[in-house]
């Protein structure tokens, strides 16, 4: 068994910026470097586009439910609480951390939460699958002999997590070195699967494309994140500890908020929803929650669900903080296994699993969700077929027309085939659902500007 030097908080919390490692610019306000990360993301175009990307249900109609933007904002809120509470607990255990950057981990986690879904293509996981399948099952399969094995592994496992790291760090045309020029700690905290596509998990998850591998290695070395792979093996690292808090915030929000949305859309009855949410608590606490709802004069069922949901999120946040603090040594040693949710106490853990089971059975397989997945898959499949072929054969007349639609920030005019293919994937994965549908209709002659 290989022995690794444990990670340490002083090294893990770094405000050094990618691409500006040697620069210390004069500051004209009191914002911390991590708050700058947060603000930079809030005002960015990729973050803004999340408002038009599906979370689970079709984009809001008359009943407003979550999209990727509202989800990311909620995850950032929970993530900030998780980080602040962990900082409070661990500084009591390690008083020497009080005079370091460690008290700011709530801001780091919050910024990383904002960025965690930036790389998701239109239509979520069905969009991911369509990009992968174009190369494994579609006309793109013939490209395998024309590209490197590392690049082929990346595109056949295309992953939103790796794409988020690329968006934040890659030097697109006309951009500065370092991409968004984020701090090392924020960047490391979004890499949920810190390994290359060649070392992808059974679910096909990985954290960075080959094009950004050197950047992640630079960050990991600086922060003392141990490399778990041996020389010659596919690259694999331990997680930065704050990844567990980002993951927990996401786990809490998507599971519990999907239950609330399902009630609003009448997929779940009020009785079903209340039962799912109240089972997180013992009988005495349930009765206190129900009595508080009565005492507050809450009679609307949607408002009752909101109150119960808030209680559940508060409980899960407390439980995840406890799990992190309890397992701090394993986390710093890179030996912690599973997510924080899997290490909370039995009652809320079983209740969370029950919510997951209901989500799979009644929500993710509901007709509105499946309709979006089917349509989204077809749209992305068609865009991949047309646009990647244009990248492969750029001199054809129709290819030039299609290439003319691509944003100038992407390296679509590169002499290198892999760069052109990746430019098209960048373009497609950055689309909103509505824009992807619009381009799909236009290139297929379904809609015309003059009609």
Question: Residue locations for each model-derived region?
Answer:
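Acidic, low-complexity proline/glycine-rich segments
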Residues: 36-48, 344-350
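C-terminal amphipathic alpha-helical interaction region
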Residues: 397-448
């Amino acid at each position: 068994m290989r022995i690794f030097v444990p990670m340490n908080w002083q090294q893990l919390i770094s405000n050094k910026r990618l691409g500006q490692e040697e620069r210390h610019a004069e500051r004209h306000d009191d914002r911390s470097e991590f708050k700058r990360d947060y603000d930079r993301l809030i005002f960015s175009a990729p973050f803004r586009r999340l408002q038009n990307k599906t979370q689970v249900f079709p984009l809001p109609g008359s009943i407003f439910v979550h999209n990727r933007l509202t989800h990311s904002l909620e995850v950032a809120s929970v993530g900030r609480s998780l980080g602040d509470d962990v900082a409070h607990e661990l500084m009591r255990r390690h008083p020497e951390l009080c005079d370091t950057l460690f008290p700011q981990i709530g801001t780091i986690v919050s910024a990383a939460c904002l960025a965690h879904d930036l790389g998701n293509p239109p239509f979520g996981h069905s969009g991911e699958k369509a990009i992968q399948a174009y190369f494994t099952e579609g006309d793109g399969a013939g490209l395998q002999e024309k590209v490197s094995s590392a690049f082929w592994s990346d595109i056949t496992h295309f992953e939103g997590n790796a794409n988020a790291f690329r968006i934040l760090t890659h030097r697109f045309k006309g951009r500065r070195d370092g991409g968004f020029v984020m701090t090392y700690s924020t960047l490391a905290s979004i890499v949920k699967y810190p390994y290359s596509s060649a070392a992808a998990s059974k679910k096909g998850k990985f954290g960075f494309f080959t094009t950004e591998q050197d950047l992640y290695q630079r960050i990991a070395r600086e922060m003392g994140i141990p490399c778990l792979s041996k020389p010659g093996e596919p690259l694999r690292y331990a997680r930065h500890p704050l990844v567990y808090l980002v993951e927990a915030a996401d786990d809490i929000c998507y599971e519990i908020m999907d239950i609330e949305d399902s009630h609003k859309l009448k997929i779940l009855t009020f009785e079903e929803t209340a039962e799912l949410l109240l089972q997180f608590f013992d009988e005495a606490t349930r009765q206190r929650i129900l009595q508080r709802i009565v005492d507050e004069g809450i009679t609307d069922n949607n408002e009752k669900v909101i109150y119960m949901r808030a209680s559940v999120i508060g409980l899960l946040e407390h439980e995840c903080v406890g799990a992190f603090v309890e397992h701090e040594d394993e986390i710093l040693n890179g030996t912690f296994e599973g997510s924080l949710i899997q290490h909370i106490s039995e009652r809320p853990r079983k209740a969370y699993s029950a919510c997951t089971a209901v989500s799979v059975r009644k929500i993710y397989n509901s007709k509105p969700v499946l309709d979006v997945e089917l349509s989204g898959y077809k749209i992305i499949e068609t865009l991949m077929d047309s646009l990647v072929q244009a990248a492969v054969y750029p001199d054809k007349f129709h290819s030039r027309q299609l290439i003319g639609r691509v944003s100038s920030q992407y390296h679509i005019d590169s002499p290198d085939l892999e760069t052109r293919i990746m430019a098209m994937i960048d373009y497609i994965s950055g689309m909103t659902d509505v824009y992807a549908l619009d381009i799909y209709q236009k290139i297929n002659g379904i809609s015309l500007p003059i009609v």
